[in-house]
Amino acid sequence: MADGANDGGNPGAEEQQRLLDQHKEAHFTAGEIVRDIIIGVSDGLTVPFALAAGLSGANASSSIVLTAGIAEVAAGAISMGLGGYLAAKSEADNYARELKREQEEIIRVPDTEAAEVAEILARYGIEPHEYGPVVNALRKKPQAWLDFMMKFELGLEKPDPKRALQSAFTIAIAYVLGGLVPLIPYMFIPVARKAVVASVILTLMALLIFGYAKGYFTDNKPFKSALQTALIGAIASAAAFGMAKAVQS
């Protein structure tokens, strides 16, 4: 028998490790951060943009639009960041609660939990004579057993303890960066009616770029994503501008 292979013709442990070292899969693993950035930037670009357009439609001066816009960006960043923190914290609390319950069940009803392991493995087409040794091996390793049940029975991944704060800051910063874009023209153009035109052009360009990047990272047709994102922003700003003009008249 050749070294590094077992009797069944499968690669041995050393050969398996060598194959794994040679094959590095290019999976994208920063999904949660990207999700937070998408949430923050999309809202940051759209909400202040609509607010600025609405105030411009009401004939407010650029200074008023800028002041109101910055106030909204600050409040929005705090609100969105807090929402991200609470969502991540709730997820972590739920994981801890389910982990404790699963630990208690493994101790109290081990046979039932072992049967659940067998049922899970059977769903993947593994036969009883094949999953039997796996079930027995897991019963001898409580932590591995617990991890298996959390992931495959409940579909829960252990959350990063830093996730809540990371989510809060990522969403808040992304919101600020996105929210300042539609306000930039009002910093340099004193007449709001002229500034709003520049704001529309600048923001739509930013929405197109952001939408393309979002589609690229989420593997969701970048050009289609760019057009959809820009369209949503355009509709929001047009609605706000039109409502302001209607109220004014």
Swiss-Prot record:
GO terms of molecular function: manganese ion transmembrane transporter activity; metal ion binding; protein homodimerization activity
Organism: Eucalyptus grandis
Other information: Can mediate sequestration of iron ions into vacuoles when expressed in the yeast ccc1 mutant.
Pfam family, one: VIT1
GO BP, sorted A to Z: intracellular manganese ion homeostasis; iron ion transport
GO CC, any one term: vacuolar membrane
Location, primary (coarse class): membrane
Protein name per its UniProtKB record: Vacuolar iron transporter 1
Recorded domain comment: The cytoplasmic metal binding domain (MBD) is located between transmembrane 2 (TM2) and transmembrane 3 (TM3).
Chain intervals for the UniProt region annotation (Cytoplasmic metal binding domain (MBD)): 90-165
Function: Vacuolar iron transporter involved in the transfer of iron ions from the cytosol to the vacuole for intracellular iron storage. Can transport cobalt ions from the cytosol to the vacuole.
Cytoplasmic side: 1-36, 85-170, 216-226
